[in-house]
Amino acid sequence: MPSASPSPEAGEVLRVFQSKAETRAFYDKISHVYDLLAEHSEGPMRRSGLEKLNVQPGEKVLEIGPGTGHSLVSLAQAVGPTGKVYGLDLSEGMLAVAQANLQKAGFSERVELIAGDALHLPYASESLDAIFMSFTLELFDTPEIPMVLAECKRVLRPGGRIAVVGVSKEGEGGFVLHAFEWTHRHFPNLLDCRPIFVRKAMEAAGFHIESAERKMMWVPVEIVLARKQLQGG
């Protein structure tokens, strides 16, 4: 039985104790059934985030943690034949499903997929117009979150946009959120993510917040759109 992590102070974001290898193996294992488990609840939130990002034809866009590729299909359609979409995921199993979905939709040539860790993005500085993350940032350990956002800031061009959809610790949690955190704390291999402060993390990383919305899935969700500042950002 997995050992429980220490009880956090009120308002403290829980740590992630599952290793990257364990996370990769978990998502490889569930890649072919992930949509059955999560798409019904995550899909509407993800689409709200894509609407806020408002990708335009010709843009270069990265999705971190694209999973089975539903957002990649939407992004590929949005950038058109003159744009480019990149997808980076820790799980090769998820990327294989995403590639199959892209081929089925006829957009595989517009999307470049790579297995990797967002702590070290394999893209040139100031090379991307926009970044999208949906239910991904909360998978990183607490000290890693600012590192991931710093990498996002590095690869975005000045004025570039980032939209993040994530399980939120903002505001009153209620029973469901407390139960979510309890499960993560006591069974980290079963529930590998936990609520985080999405907007606050992005502000701390130096992004200019353009909009922030809080919605209810079965847990609270933040949908935040931000921009890398033109000067000094």
Residue ranges and their predicted role:
Residues 40-57:
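Conserved alpha-helix/loop element of class I SAM-dependent methyltransferases that forms part
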Residues 62-120:
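Class I SAM-dependent methyltransferase SAM/SAH-binding core
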